[in-house]
Amino acid sequence: MFNNDKVKIGICPIGWTNDDMPDLGKENTFEQAVSEMALAGFKGTEIGNKYPKDVKVLKRALEMRNLQIASAWFSSFLTTKPYEETEKEFIAHRDFLHAMGSKVIVVSEQGHSIQGQMETPIFDGKHHFNEEEWNLLAHGLNKLGQLAADKEMRIVYHHHMGTGVQTTEEIDKLMSVTDENLVYLLFDTGHLVYSGENPVEILKKYVQRIKHVHLKDIRPEIVSKVKNEKLSFLKGVRAGAFTVPGDGSIDFEPIFKILAENNYEGWLMIEAEQDPSIANPLEYAIKGRQYIKEKASI
């Protein structure tokens, strides 16, 4: 199966507190979140809004718990704002992650995104990039990829519901118009299945460019409700569309098998945003970690 020296298991803080909807988990502190991550058996995390902004403070808090920073989300606006604005913010983001020892930077284009809009139907209101926007995106991502490479890091592009890169066709387009040596892919099981894509086929096609993995499961009955009732992405999260691996409908065994057979190296991150007042974060973290141990032997 996996080379246990090359693959690390982490969990994102969004199960404890939601940066897009701060009322979800507002009672959960940074210290509680990272302590429970360590208690549940994880080795890493991504950065949330409640995390200390000082490198020394953050490092000390994580070292006490034997945790590392795997990465952190970066919103680019390459299709809607001057490139220089994104670059300036990216460099600061890159340098912080570099200081924390991270090797990958999660990037998602938020120009024209509806993922943060509370009333826009996620299945009906999505923007589709025109050729000019694709060119702006590709050119900008290649530049960001080079800036990451300058620090011996990589950018991994996060396909996401409600954005211009969501579907199989859009992922194919992104991969074809960007430099394969500068722009890599983040593989997110939940967003692919939510969108109606086949995650196994996408994984097979791009496994050599996939350098970061988000493991999330879906509750199909909630996704159907979101579609039928024309709900937004955020309302879907509140309703419980996502959950940890093993608690929904996705079969992760073939996914683990393909990654292992292709000698995947890097992080496998549980990222499962739901209401922590309903889904206790520690309980679900333990549940997800146990599932990975059972199915991936890691």
From Swiss-Prot:
Recorded GO MF terms: manganese ion binding; myo-inosose-2 dehydratase activity
Keywords: Cobalt, Lyase, Manganese
EC numbers: 4.2.1.44
Taxonomic superkingdom: Bacteria
InterPro entries, alphabetized: IolE, IolE/MocC, IolE/XylAMocC-like, Xyl_isomerase-like_sf, Xyl_isomerase-like_TIM-brl
Coiled-coil residues: none
Names of the cofactor(s): glutathione; Co(2+); Mn(2+)
A single GO BP: inositol catabolic process
Pathway(s) served: Polyol metabolism; myo-inositol degradation into acetyl-CoA; acetyl-CoA from myo-inositol: step 2/7
Catalytic activity: scyllo-inosose = 3D-3,5/4-trihydroxycyclohexane-1,2-dione + H2O
Residue intervals passing through the bilayer: none
Family designation: Belongs to the IolE/MocC family.
Name of the protein in question: Inosose dehydratase
UniProt organism field: Clostridium botulinum (strain Eklund 17B / Type B)
Name of the coding gene: iolE
